[in-house]
């Protein structure tokens, strides 16, 4: 039987495979013959006639090299050894059966199982897993069915679709029902995720609030430490000045020492004839302005973390309309004045009144705070300077008030009067008395102070010597400008001043440059070296109430309800905008311009995007309850905004 099967083989070779095959590799003669035929056909194809391809010689050489390499015994052993390893053996796991069984039957400890949270959801874990799977397969099958249905239409002739079998409809219904249930599971999962996100956001807001409170406490503690350190430094300086044996030059202030050398040299002969040197040295020297630098290790940053328009603090500062406010830096020291004839010093960090500045005989109309120096201009026609670093608090026993004032303090209804029942003594420096009418505007920088008065004059003061060095007549300058002629670039407005407005509404100086806004709507730029008007800016149709300039622009506010931005390089209007009511106060920083425009909110203008928005208590006021009072004065520094209202309230905002 085996012999007959061997004879029937077309190749004449035996097809009977020994257990180990040829060469012990499991290969049969049929496999070798098939391999030889494939090699022959491939070689014949590659090494065809040389006329068909120019690369035939290269193919012939390559195949000869391959044939020579395959005839080597080492190469044959390597090729035949690969047949002993099946693909299953190559990818088979190296783990033993014992290891696999051990891992399969491993269980979790009871401690971990006890920590599994209880789920109140009505959906199982498997349903949630199925809900997260995409339904692409359903969409593909649905498209295939619809495409097949469309192919049944031939030549554009619509035929009635054959009715589906009930079993198919039931399958479709079950499939749609299952997908609808999965949609419910997915909606529940989305709702849970949204709820978790809301909880995380609420927790973050609470954490941010806690950190802000901590930052506020740190800044308050920092302010107290700096205040105590400043007091100790001042006491040490006072002790050194009062200690006997120190040089006589110590009794003379350092700020006025160099400035008075020329004066002493000129009047030395008169001093010798007037009195002896020993008697002259025993005379008490008047107080001089001593600018002590405030020790500030770091600037407050709390207001930078509030959103714009957020209220920081509100204080009932006065009992009447606020006429002037100013502060040195955010959360620092504020000085406010009102029609109640008081000037109060406040700690913006704690909102506490530190005391009164007493000395004026009438209400203060204007003031400025620069470091520890305060300048106040009053309706009594005087300008007084104060040094807050010398302040010493004493009870206010000489107050002039109503007979029932003490009863109000005992009741505690007026909180700020209890906290502010002290006077700041020893901080008065000197008074500048030369005007004959109320002082309506002032500004000082360095050792120069400019004051404007209702007597229609501007006066330049030397703060070192405490005397007036120059008087500028505004009416004379206006008359001189009107007689120059019609060929001048800047013409006088020709309008009469408003009787209800201040003749000098605002002033600002920088070195030898002075800007002054008056009741005739003119903005005059003076040169203090010559005492002449360098340029006049015409554009406003009402009295100027406020102005401020920097290196490039000058911003002015007027009772004509407009704010104008001037280009100092060209002398022309750069930008302008108006509000519904007259502008009473204005100030700007690097980002925004704020203004008080006769409303219960502060008008804010963003320089970058030219956006207008409101800030103040009037935004959140209830229509039923009483509305906040009108804002009269505004001050802005480094995004920290102060507003003074008509009812005596002063509030701090982020801007």
Swiss-Prot record:
Keyword field contains tRNA-binding: no
Region (Disordered): 1-22, 134-170, 240-263
Protein name listed in UniProt: Mitochondrial division protein 1
UniProt subcellular location: Mitochondrion outer membrane
SUPFAM superfamilies: WD40 repeat-like
InterPro entries: G-protein_beta_WD-40_rep, WD40/YVTN_repeat-like_dom_sf, WD40_repeat_CS, WD40_repeat_dom_sf, WD40_rpt
Family matches, as PANTHER family: WD REPEAT DOMAIN 5B, WD40 REPEAT PROTEIN
Coiled-coil regions listed: 199-244
Highest taxon, organism lineage: Eukaryota
Keywords attached to this entry: Coiled coil, Membrane, Mitochondrion, Mitochondrion outer membrane, Repeat, WD repeat
Function (record text): Involved in mitochondrial fission. Acts as an adapter protein required to form mitochondrial fission complexes. Formation of these complexes is required to promote constriction and fission of the mitochondrial compartment at a late step in mitochondrial division.
